[in-house]
Amino acid sequence: MDDSETGFNLKVVLVSFKQCLDEKEEVLLDPYIASWKGLVRFLNSLGTIFSFISKDVVSKLRIMERLRGGPQSEHYRSLQAMVAHELSNRLVDLERRSHHPESGCRTVLRLHRALHWLQLFLEGLRTSPEDARTSALCADSYNASLAAYHPWVVRRAVTVAFCTLPTREVFLEAMNVGPPEQAVQMLGEALPFIQRVYNVSQKLYAEHSLLDLP
């Protein structure tokens, strides 16, 4: 995960997300992990404000990298293969955390939820006017996604922290693809791929009743 500290470029993340789905619409975990590493670089480039999310994401990515590099790596090539493997071998804690707190299914679910928040926030940045308040955009995205899984104390602290967010222009410049209007255009290309990966993952987890894993 050392490369999570290097510079962010939205084009690189776009390429990674384009590679996430194969011809069978399976979510390939290597490009999924690579995509998230790029998003972590974006969050880290904006300072410590998003550290409560990026630190958790980094820990989850390390778990997934261990699974991909372990003796059962062939079962972790895609999200679909992972779900089938872990469910058939009872490697998932379905009702309460006990024997498998670092199962791939639980780990990806946390990444999946965070991706929903980031997708909503980036879409807000893309479609909002130049003078839009990023604190409001981020809070709205958070309340529509991650907030449901955080205790009140965390929700309160996060909402207060959002008030210190930089301007919309600073966010767009942090994407390193040129002027703000070019970043908006690039987001328009990237977000449909992110949305597609999210939708396929959501459908898979819903089909197997995995959306509320402890």
Swiss-Prot record:
Mutagenesis / variant outcome for changing D56V: Slightly decreases phosphoceramide transfer
Compartments where located: Cytoplasm, Cytosol; Golgi apparatus, trans-Golgi network membrane; Cell membrane; Endosome membrane
GO molecular function, one term: phospholipid binding
Catalysed reactions, as listed in the record: N-(hexadecanoyl)-sphing-4-enine-1-phosphate(in) = N-(hexadecanoyl)-sphing-4-enine-1-phosphate(out); N-(9Z-octadecenoyl)-sphing-4-enine-1-phosphate(in) = N-(9Z-octadecenoyl)-sphing-4-enine-1-phosphate(out)
Residue numbers binding an N-acylsphingoid base 1-phosphate: D56, K60, R106, R110, H150
Tagged with keyword Cell membrane: yes
Outcome reported for the amino acid change (mutating F50R): Slightly reduces phosphoceramide transfer
Major place of residence: cytoplasm
Gene Ontology BP term (one): ceramide 1-phosphate transport
Domain of life: Eukaryota
Entry coiled-coil feature ranges: none
Keyword presence, Protein transport: no
Membrane topology field: Peripheral membrane protein
Any one of the GO CC terms: endosome membrane
Alphabetized UniProt keyword annotations: Cell membrane, Cytoplasm, Endosome, Golgi apparatus, Lipid transport, Lipid-binding, Membrane, Nucleus, Transport
Tissues/organs with expression: Ubiquitous. Detected in heart, brain, placenta, lung, liver, skeletal muscle, kidney, pancreas, spleen, thymus, prostate, testis, ovary, small intestine, colon and peripheral blood leukocytes.
Outcome (variant: V158N): Abolishes phosphoceramide transfer
Biological role: Mediates the intracellular transfer of ceramide-1-phosphate (C1P) between organelle membranes and the cell membrane. Required for normal structure of the Golgi stacks. Can bind phosphoceramides with a variety of aliphatic chains, but has a preference for lipids with saturated C16:0 or monounsaturated C18:1 aliphatic chains, and is inefficient with phosphoceramides containing lignoceryl (C24:0). Plays a role in the regulation of the cellular levels of ceramide-1-phosphate, and thereby contributes to the regulation of phospholipase PLA2G4A activity and the release of arachidonic acid.
PANTHER family linked: CERAMIDE-1-PHOSPHATE TRANSFER PROTEIN, GLYCOLIPID TRANSFER PROTEIN-RELATED
Protein name (Swiss-Prot/TrEMBL): Ceramide-1-phosphate transfer protein
